[in-house]
Amino acid sequence: MPRTQKNDNFVDKSFTVMADIILKILPTNKKAKEAFVYYRDGMSAQAEGEYAEALEYYEEALTLEEDTNDRGYILYNMGLIYASNGDHDKALELYHQAIELNPRLPQALNNIAVIYHYQGEKAKETGDHDGGEALFDQAADYWIRAIRMAPNNYIEAQNWLKTTGRMQIDVFF
């Protein structure tokens, strides 16, 4: 049974109805519509914590989706799942692929920075000060890129950049 028939939550039902209406009126080809259905079902499964199911839907959406920006969003969502499951290497791989396809994804840049920062903290905890600092520098690079795209977001990252001396004064102008 398609996920769209299983939604019992009002918001999910509303989203599904709206998405179905949009799919019917937008002048897109059949393949693009199918890709969107899988993407929508993947988002629904992901929101419910059904990560394995969400990944299956996203994989199918990737095989059908031709638009590079949309493929970037699919890969980004897949990265979210892997990151939440602790597979940071796979998440980084997917976030980097997402940015290659859709460079206007500050949220992917932010998530890459968060992972590098986390890895830097872990490296320092194990006594690898230089490795930790190198990872912090990588995190800073990605946060700066994200903040340049979305200057009103990532306030904590901006504060971290300032307090660690990793931010140039004019970086966000």
From Swiss-Prot:
InterPro entries: PSI_Ycf3_assembly, TPR-like_helical_dom_sf, TPR_rpt, Ycf3/AcsC/BcsC/TPR_MFPF. SUPFAM superfamilies: TPR-like. It comes from Nostoc sp. (strain PCC 7120 / SAG 25.82 / UTEX 2576). GO terms for cellular component: plasma membrane-derived thylakoid membrane. This is Photosystem I assembly protein Ycf3. It is a peripheral membrane protein. Keywords: Membrane, Photosynthesis, Repeat, Thylakoid, TPR repeat. Its main location: membrane.
